[in-house]
């Protein structure tokens, strides 16, 4: 059998047979894959750590008839801190669920984005919503929708008040809004701008106010649902 190595993060899995597990991973090289871990539910299995959600490392795999088989694993980071803090755990699960919803083939920028998000979530104590807001904003931007505009997408007038048109996923002015528009407050817009312009490593240096990050989470979650049909997991 031919073997290969991939760098991947575990999204989740399903127990099969008596001791095996099917693993869902997102890899740098090939995108989303399903892999088989043989005998991994045995107490002395050398691959036990590889079956855990959030685990990031290098998988050594062999080609199988239908599903490739993991034969070795070198952990890079298992982000264990996420499993010891319930709020971080919920936020981390929501991030991986979003990744699972949009990922398919190889996407190196998305891979780097999710590792950066989980690393910051695990090792920094940031206010709630900062990280998932930035991750959602990046996903929506990658889908081709821009929140950070100074002009109405319909009439091009300079914006003094902003509304998200959920029908088209674009920002409009008061004159162009309809019944399916959501108001974006100045605090929310300021939060979106700061989060977008800051790297994950620099999020600890910014301070948002007026509950802008919470409003941003609600608006981004609603917009993501309208754009993809996928409901963002609750982190409350």
Predicted stretch roles:
Residues 1-21, 26-236:
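Non-catalytic alpha-helical scaffolds and adjoining flexible linkers that form interface surfaces
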């Amino acid at each position: 059998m031919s073997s290969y190595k991939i760098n991947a993060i575990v999204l989740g899995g399903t127990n099969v047979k008596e001791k095996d597990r099917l693993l869902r991973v997102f890899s740098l090289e090939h995108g989303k894959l399903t892999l088989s871990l043989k005998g991994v539910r045995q107490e002395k299995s050398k691959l036990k750590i590889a079956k855990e959600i959030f685990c990031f490392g290098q998988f050594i795999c062999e080609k199988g008839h239908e599903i490739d088989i993991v034969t070795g694993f070198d952990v890079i980071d298992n982000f264990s801190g996420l499993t010891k803090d319930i709020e971080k755990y919920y936020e981390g699960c929501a991030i991986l669920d979003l990744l699972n919803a949009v990922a398919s083939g190889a996407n190196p920028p998305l891979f780097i984005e999710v590792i950066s998000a989980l690393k910051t979530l695990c090792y920094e104590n940031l206010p709630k919503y900062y990280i998932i807001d930035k991750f959602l904003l990046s996903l929506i931007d990658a889908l081709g929708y821009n929140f950070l505009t100074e002009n109405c997408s319909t009439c091009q007038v300079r914006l003094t008040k902003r509304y998200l048109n959920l029908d088209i996923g674009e920002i409009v002015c008061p004159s162009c809004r309809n019944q399916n528009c959501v108001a974006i407050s100045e605090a929310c817009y300021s939060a979106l701008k700061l989060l977008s312009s800051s790297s994950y490593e620099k999020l600890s240096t910014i301070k948002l106010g007026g509950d802008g990050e919470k409003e941003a989470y609600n608006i981004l979650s609603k917009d993501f649902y309208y754009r993809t049909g996928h409901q963002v997991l609750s982190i409350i």
